[in-house]
């Protein structure tokens, strides 16, 4: 993740307006923290209550008001492996809707760069990862 953020942030103005969609999730919070550590001060994050990314009108209004220059899209409709397997159509539909809204408004508003991170499931809540080993080099 650090290599990705090092590459992405080397070209950004420290005062640029940066929107991190999904800033409270696993990946989005890591991006937010990394940007803060690198001295970025104009970060925008909205909770689901503040901005429903499934609502295209609300997303357009947000982009109209905030005018972000850069967007990290780490937001997703999530629910765990079991819910993902039971409600597959709901998950793909809602996630495509979020992506369409954020990517579409980024394009319409002339966002300089957008980084889209997509995954159906990152980590289950209660699973042991003891079988994984750390890289040796």
Each language-model region and where it sits:
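Conserved catalytic-site region of short-chain dehydrogenase/reductase
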Residues: 81, 117-129
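Conserved small/polar residues in nucleotide/adenosyl-binding loops
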Residues: 129-136
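N-terminal Rossmann NAD(P)H-binding glycine-rich loop of SDR-like oxidoreductase domains
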Residues: 17-34
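Adenosine-cofactor binding site in Rossmann-like domains, unifying the SAM/SAH pocket
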Residues: 42-61
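A short, basic/flexible loop-to-alpha-helix module at the beginning of a structural domain
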Residues: 2-13
């Amino acid at each position: 993740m650090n290599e990705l953020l090092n590459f992405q942030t080397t070209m950004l103005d420290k005062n640029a307006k940066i929107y991190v969609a999904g800033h409270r999730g696993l990946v989005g919070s890591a991006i937010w923290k990394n940007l803060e550590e690198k001295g970025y001060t104009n970060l925008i994050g909205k909770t689901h209550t503040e901005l429903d990314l499934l609502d295209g009108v609300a997303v357009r209004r947000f982009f109209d008001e905030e005018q972000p220059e850069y967007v990290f899209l780490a937001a997703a409709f999530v629910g765990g492996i079991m819910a993902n397997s039971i409600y597959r159509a709901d998950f793909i539909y809602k996630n495509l809707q979020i992506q369409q809204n954020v990517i579409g408004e980024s394009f319409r508003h002339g966002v300089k760069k957008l980084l889209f991170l997509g995954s159906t499931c990152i980590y289950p809540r209660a699973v042991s990862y003891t079988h994984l080993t750390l890289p040796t080099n």
